[in-house]
Amino acid sequence: MNLEITNHFIKAISVILPKNPLRKEDELKLCNINERKYQLLQENSGIFNHFVSDESTYSSDLATQALEEFLSKDILKKDEIDLLVFTSFTPDYLAPACTSLIHKNLNLSSHTLCLDVLGFCPGFLQSLLQVFLALNQPSIKKAVLICASVKSKAIDAQKDKITFLNNSDSASAILIEKNTNIEDKSYFAQKIFSTQCIEETLPYNGLQTNSNKNIQANTALAFSFTMQNYPAFFQDFLEHFNLKKTSFNEFFIHSSDNFSKQKLYEKLNLNFTQDNILKNYGNTTINKLPLELASYAGGGINKFYLEALEQGLPLMHVA
């Protein structure tokens, strides 16, 4: 599906990373891995730091802190929030909704429209689309999109040590304001490949008795799928909207490690540089793209390209 819609303004981004409750020595012992193997993992992944929440910190806690940054710094007033969207694959509960917890924690206005979305790696882009569509409504002028992950709580550190040591828990709050110039456009595209969805990501949590308590993905399947399908999707997106690669100030393409990103950039004929976001902050999953935008050195990007891969399920772009 390809969509051309009104482009709205990303005005501010707040990113929260928890402080690791464990020392490196404790983590290596937990994962049953020695120092030399850990160094090899760092060299291969390009990840030299990661952030894990403590036992009492959950998605709603990090999300509350991210939004509170806007309020405490007078970037936004409570009664200005017309729409609050929360996206995560690690919510505190199925009920009550995390937006209700955030709303209660910060005593937000009763007029704020709240929406909870189940979202994995492309969750930021999927929810960004929903926010952009909502901002076309006359009564919605300012929206906050919150993405949060405490994936560390759903990883078996003994059996999936690489994922645990690369993962970072995080939350982001993105303030998005209405653009009244309807001639200013943004472009979204998504393509779904569901044939191998259960093989790529094993059923996780939920009410079915055959689901797993821990998140586990087939990374080899995800990598081969991406290399096979993404380049054509990338090219189709540009051609459909008559866009040129040279017209973009920056490309932000989600990847969980430097090796995969380098191979993909080679396929796309894009200039690859080592990913400092991965190096300094680890794999922040749903918050990789918000962190990229918040950390962009130039600031004030006029035209950029965002992309996320759902490890073999949706492929998604926004420009």
Predicted segments, located by residue:
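Flexible, glycine-rich active-site loops centered on histidine and acidic residues
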Residues: P138-S170
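A glycine- and small-aliphatic-rich helix-loop capping segment at beta-alpha/alpha-beta transitions
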Residues: E27-K29, C98-S109, F132-Q137, K159-N166, ...
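Conserved beta-ketoacyl condensing-enzyme motif
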Residues: I10, E55-C121, L238-K261
